Amino acid sequence: MRLVKKNVVINGIYEAGVRYPEPANISYLWNFGFFSLICLIIQLVSGILLAMHYSAHVDLAFNSIERLVREVDYGWLLRYIHANGASFFFIVVYIHMLRGLYFGSYQKPNAMLWVSGVVIFLLLIITGFLGYVLPWGQMSYWAATVITNLVTVLPVIGEDIVIWLWGGFNVDNPTLNRFFSLHYLCPFIIVGLVGLHIIFLRENGSTNPLGVKSHVDQIPFTPYFTIKDLFSFMIFLVLFFTFVFFAPNYLGHPDNYLMADSNVTPAHIVPEWYLLPFYAMLRSIPNKVLGVLALVLAIVVLAFLPFLTIAEVRSSYFRKIHKHLFWSFLALCFFLGFLGSQPAAAPYLICGLYSTIAYFIYILVLFPCIYIVEKMIIKTIMKTTVKKA
């Protein structure tokens, strides 16, 4: 113990991983932050190994991946770990964010913790899109063409930025090189932001299902939560490798097994499944500028939630109206995801437009203001009870 106390690094690890006090009543939903870190490590390691065999050239990229799968020892395993790792990364991040919404973990004094999380989420989306282009399949090529074209909505500089991104006048070899470089760089930026995220977490401590700050009902992280994390980690690995070994392409798109061809447009251009809700918002608005604005604001507006909400009671455990509101919001997000996977035609576009409006009403109006309604109802009930007494 004396050695631990003397060494700054060892003492820091000891304080963070052994003695760190956690609320005694947190559930398994609090494990998804840990899962996110595990997914980040999996993606970093598998991505670095994949980069050793990848050729960032339009004539070689597709074939280099096929060679990896067919000829490199366990290359198929590397590819499917990385591909399914991206999907599982977004699954655990979405659950992590939804848990924060449900239990009010985003509210002050955890505002900066939430904002840093939204920044990480935004960077994850960018990294996921960049990685989606690298296999240079049909869907990769056309997704890159469609999404990069959205930058043209920027006044004056939009066209110049697109030409710079493309490295020419269409998506080609310079584009692939740029995307590969950025895709390799972004995870390391995410690692830095995750470190900042953890610092903000340590500043105010973890929240709990009751949403009540307590310095009394806390227990050390080890052994209680270490065992809990290890148990849930084993379950996570079972689910993850079930997809890797038995359904490796279930979360992907079959068109990406066709080499990119600029002369053949896919019948239905779609991004990866985890971006479908935002894609539905983008294409449901007829005006291109407003569509891009809605796409960006749908993510950015989440960062303003801590500053819009003034609820004294955080957790939905005590807020029945907020609880029903949350589940209806979750259903709306699933519905947007479904709409994003459908062809760009009626009735999906009009449903997407109304769902997009509903999404912003939930975030900007209902979530911040529902506490006022709840407070009025509680006061009315209390007055009625006092009169009866």
Swiss-Prot record:
Keyword Mitochondrion: yes
GO MF term set: metal ion binding; ubiquinol-cytochrome-c reductase activity
A Gene Ontology term for the protein's cellular component: respiratory chain complex III
Sequence positions that bind heme b b566: H96, H197
Keyword Mitochondrion attached: yes
Record-linked PROSITE patterns: CYTB_CTER, CYTB_NTER
Compartments in which it is found: Mitochondrion inner membrane
Chain ranges passing through the membrane: 32-52, 76-98, 113-133, 179-199, 225-245, 290-310, 325-345, 353-373
Cross-referenced Pfam families: Cytochrom_B_C, Cytochrome_B
Cofactor(s) required, per the database record: heme b
Details of cofactor binding: Binds 2 heme b groups non-covalently.
Keywords: Electron transport, Heme, Iron, Membrane, Metal-binding, Mitochondrion, Mitochondrion inner membrane, Respiratory chain, Transmembrane, Transmembrane helix, Transport, Ubiquinone
Biological process annotations from GO: mitochondrial electron transport, ubiquinol to cytochrome c
Membrane topology: Multi-pass membrane protein
Binding site for heme b b562: H82, H183
UniProt family annotation: Belongs to the cytochrome b family.
PANTHER family per record: CYTOCHROME B (PTHR19271:SF16)
Function: Component of the ubiquinol-cytochrome c reductase complex (complex III or cytochrome b-c1 complex) that is part of the mitochondrial respiratory chain. The b-c1 complex mediates electron transfer from ubiquinol to cytochrome c. Contributes to the generation of a proton gradient across the mitochondrial membrane that is then used for ATP synthesis.
Quaternary assembly: The main subunits of complex b-c1 are: cytochrome b, cytochrome c1 and the Rieske protein.
Comment field (misc): Heme 1 (or BL or b562) is low-potential and absorbs at about 562 nm, and heme 2 (or BH or b566) is high-potential and absorbs at about 566 nm.
Name this polypeptide is given: Cytochrome b
Protein species of origin: Dictyostelium discoideum
Designated gene of the protein: cytB
